[in-house]
C-alpha cells in the first residue's frame, strides 16, 4: 500500500512538472491551463498581447518557438490596457498646463519618456515634464489614480 501511494505521488509530481514546462522539441505543448483569469501582458519586441494567465502565455510561447517566432515576454500590464494617444493634453480636455505653483524649469534636452495612467499612454520630451504635467493635472482636480507614471525611459 505504501509503495502504491509513493508511486502515485511520483507520477503526480512528474505530471505536474511536465504540465508546467514549455517544450521546444517534438513533444506536445501544454494546452490545459486553469480557468483562472489573472491577465498577463506580453511583448515580442514589436507587439503587445494580453493573455488570460501566465500559463496561457507559456503555452502560446511554446507554439511560437516551434515556428521559430519570437516568444512573448511578460511586461507591464499598462502596455496592453492603455490606449496610445498622440496629443495627451487634448485628449484630457485641454486643462491648464501653465500653472504657477507647478512651474519647474526643465531642460530642453530631448530624452523621450513613455508615460501611462493605466487608461492612456503617451510620450513626453523628458521626465521633468512628467512632474509638471501631473502637478497641473492635480490642480485641475484630477484624482491620484488619474495621474501619470513612467512606463519606460524611451519612446512608446
Swiss-Prot record:
Site (Reactive bond): 35-36, 108-109
GO molecular function: serine-type endopeptidase inhibitor activity
CDD domains linked to this entry: KAZAL_FS (cd00104)
Signal peptide extent: 1-19
Keywords in alphabetical order: Disulfide bond, Protease inhibitor, Repeat, Serine protease inhibitor, Signal
Pfam families documented for this protein: Kazal_2
Disulfide bonds: 29-62, 33-55, 102-135, 106-128, 114-156
Kazal-like domain residues: 23-81, 96-156
Record's protein name: Enhancer of split M1 protein
Lineage, uppermost ranks: Eukaryota, Metazoa, Ecdysozoa, Arthropoda, Hexapoda
